Amino acid sequence: MKTSALFVIFGLVLLFCNSFAAELKTTGRGCGGLMAGCGGKSTFCCSGYNCSPTWKWCVYARPGRR
């Protein structure tokens, strides 16, 4: 009984991941969200995020931060 419940949960997780990946592929998202890698040349951060020069990933844009 426990094994079949785990298989059902695992199947639902796989279905969710597959649909999420298909959605990302169709939208063609060209900007990065929180902690997405950014370089400033080919990859950019979405609105509300800035590319951290130290870590090279997108961080929250704060007032007063350059």
From Swiss-Prot:
Claim: Cell inner membrane is one of the keywords in the record: no
Top-level taxon of the source organism: Eukaryota
Tissue: Expressed by the venom gland.
GO molecular function, one term: toxin activity
Propeptide: 22-29
Pfam families in alphabetical order: Toxin_12
Signal peptide start and end residues: 1-21
GO CC term (a single one): extracellular region
InterPro entries per record: Huwentoxin-1, Huwentoxin_CS1
Cystine bridges: 31-46, 38-51, 45-58
Keyword terms: Disulfide bond, Ion channel impairing toxin, Knottin, Secreted, Signal, Toxin
Localisation: Secreted
Domain remarks in the Swiss-Prot or TrEMBL record: The presence of a 'disulfide through disulfide knot' structurally defines this protein as a knottin.
Chain's role: Probable ion channel inhibitor.
Family under the similarity heading: Belongs to the neurotoxin 10 (Hwtx-1) family. 46 (Jztx-7/10/12) subfamily.
Protein name, entry field: U1-theraphotoxin-Cg1b
